[in-house]
Amino acid sequence: MTKPTEDDPKGISRRPAAFSLEQEASREGAHTKTTAETPRRKPQSFDTEIVLTPDEEDPFLNPALTASDAEAAIAAPRRRRFSFGKVALSAFGILVSLAFGLWTDELIRNLFSRADWLGYTALTVLAIGILAVLAIVVRETAGMMRLAAVQTIKAEADAAVVETRPARAKALVQRLCTLLEANPATAKGRATLKAAEDDIIDAPHLIDLAERELLGPLDRSARVLILGASKRVSVVTAVSPRALVDILYVLYESAKLVRAMAELYGGRPGGLGMLKLMRDVLAHLAVTGSIAVGDSIVQQLIGHGLASKLSARLGEGVVNGMMTARIGIAAMDLCRPLSFKALKRPGIGDFVGDLAPNITGR
């Protein structure tokens, strides 16, 4: 036993021990040998071109840029190809126009040869007809341009959302107010936007506010139009004796609904514009798959307890009413000057609860 010390208070001393340093020395020697055998790289110079990306173009700061690029790639329109059918129609149209001109010239000459007052009467009637045709052309052109303006505003709004500066969004909202100024339902919304014009500096928030204030009342009116057309189609289909009557009435109500939807959102299409709009609506239905009446509607009807209560004619009426509602929703998507972002897009399920009780009499 040893006496306790300050380092060892219990008095227990550690025995001497030996440690080998050969392994560590061999490791250091191998590392030195490897370093000596490895040749050193000569100094080199590199030319680097540093490009600074602006904040508004940086995809890490603006994730919406990548999303918009993907959507644009998906929604890119198909490239139009050369059509021999259009060439043939144009050629025959010119030929018919020349034939009509020669026939008119010969008719007027014959009338002048018989009596001067007949010739002048024919010239007056021809002038009135030409002026009427010019007026129709101007009206159709204005309607097409107005429909194009609505689509332009929608495309520019989607592009202005990703920008940090609000100048483009403010100009877009001003154009939207000008487009909808004839509708008294947007007066309150236009006043609200005018009052908050200098308070909002964020472009997405400004466009969302414009959608809620300007298009919110119009969306409610559009829902009333869709529901009314769907109910009328359901009732007429249920009581009509012939299937041909059903088809004709569905076409009539669909065309009437599409025109009303276009006029509600600021577009006033003419005859050609209406044909183009109907074609776009049918194409939209075909792309989204909304034109198919399948198990989804059947499940909705069963969920409302109608499967055991409706007769065959009443069931057809409900299905045709749902089809009319789908056409109205597609027209709403196309005619609306802004895409659905701040407000919820209506679905077919929003109309089943209102349409089915109307058919069952509850």
From Swiss-Prot:
Keywords associated with the record: Cell inner membrane, Cell membrane, Membrane, Transmembrane, Transmembrane helix
Name by which UniProt lists this protein: UPF0283 membrane protein Arad_2632
Basic and acidic residues: bias regions: 1-11
Subcellular location: Cell inner membrane
Organism of derivation: Rhizobium rhizogenes (strain K84 / ATCC BAA-868) (Agrobacterium radiobacter)
InterPro entries in the record: DUF697, UPF0283
Membrane topology: Multi-pass membrane protein
Residue numbers spanned by region Disordered: 1-47
UniProt similarity note: Belongs to the UPF0283 family.
Domain of life: Bacteria
Taxonomic lineage of the native organism: Bacteria, Pseudomonadati, Pseudomonadota, Alphaproteobacteria, Hyphomicrobiales
TM stretches of this protein: 82-102, 118-138
Cellular component aspect of the GO annotation: plasma membrane
